[in-house]
Each structure stands twice: as C-alpha cells, then as structure tokens.
Amino acid sequence: ATKSSAVYRLRDRVNALVDGICWKFTQSDGQEVACSHAGFCSSWVRKLWSPSEGLDKLVEKTNNMLLKDGNHSMGKLSTAGRERGGFGCPSPCWAGEHELRAEGIKGFTQIVGHSAQNTVVKSKTVNNDVLWFCDTHSWLTNTTRGDDSFLMYDDNTNKYTVLKPY
C-alpha cells in the first residue's frame, strides 16, 4: 500500500469512531483538548456550561443537543456569528476562525474543522490557548481548497504532527 492510501484508511477509521459533533481527549501532559466541527466560543457556551464542570460535561451537553434533543436544540446549534453572516453567538456548528481567536473557550486546546485552510494551521486565541484549524479538503466556489492534510497527536511524545497524503 502507498503512504497516501494508508493515510486515507487511517482517516476513515477515525471518522468511524466519532459520534456526535464534538469530543475531547486529554494530552499526556494533562492539557484537555476539545475537538469539534467549528469550535467553541465563550459567548455560546456561557449559557450551557461553566468551566468548573469540566470539558467532559460540555461535550456531553453539546452532543445531547444534537443526538437526543432533536429539533428542540437545533436552533441553538445553528446560530452563526457575524463572521458567517449571522447575529447570534457562534455555535460549534458555525463558529468562524476569527471568532475562535477572539473568544475561544479559555484554558483548553481546540481542534476544529469548518474554516477552510490550505493546510493544517496552528494558531492561538487572545488568551494564548492553542487552536488547530484542520479543514483542508473543502469545496469552495467550484474549486477545492486544501492539501488534504490532517493532524495526528502522539501521546508518547506529547507532540502534534501534520500528515499530508502525498
């Protein structure tokens, strides 16, 4: 098998494990990491969650909104901020890159998609928390954007690596 086909098989296996719109893991150094479609902004989570509850609770509450609450919670999950043409608090379905930098949840690393990039990008929030932008396979205005790279975390070394399929 080629390196490219191995990368795609790995991506497919990871996709099969993810259930819901977000999940979390803890790095080997104890840092908690939130993984979601578009990212968590403090203005959106403020009414739903307190950092004292822990990241597990935010993930649980957000996924329950999608998987259990159904249409009752779809309005909350669908809110878009000004960056995406809306007027509400940016939800984890619609948060934009600039909104995350300005108001990403404090104290947590975030790994997100949704904001198209040419390659995986590491950034920081105004609170100096790490943001990884990983949407590298988008289709915009009849052209593709991105190099299909993705992010891998190694808990033995506590390091992230950007993998490219070719």
Name each region found by the language model.
Residues 1-103:
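Active-site-proximal loop/helix segment associated with metal-binding centers of metalloenzymes
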Residues 122-166:
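Binuclear metal-dependent phosphoesterase catalytic core
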Residues 35-36, 110-115, 133-136:
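Active-site neighborhood of phospho(di)ester-bond hydrolases with catalytic His/Asp-centered motifs
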Residues 15, 63-64, 71-73, 118, ...:
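Detector for Asparagine
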Residues 41-43, 101-102, 111-123, 139-142:
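Active-site environment of divalent metal-dependent phosphoester hydrolases
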Residues 31-33, 108, 129:
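Conserved catalytic motifs of the protein kinase core domain
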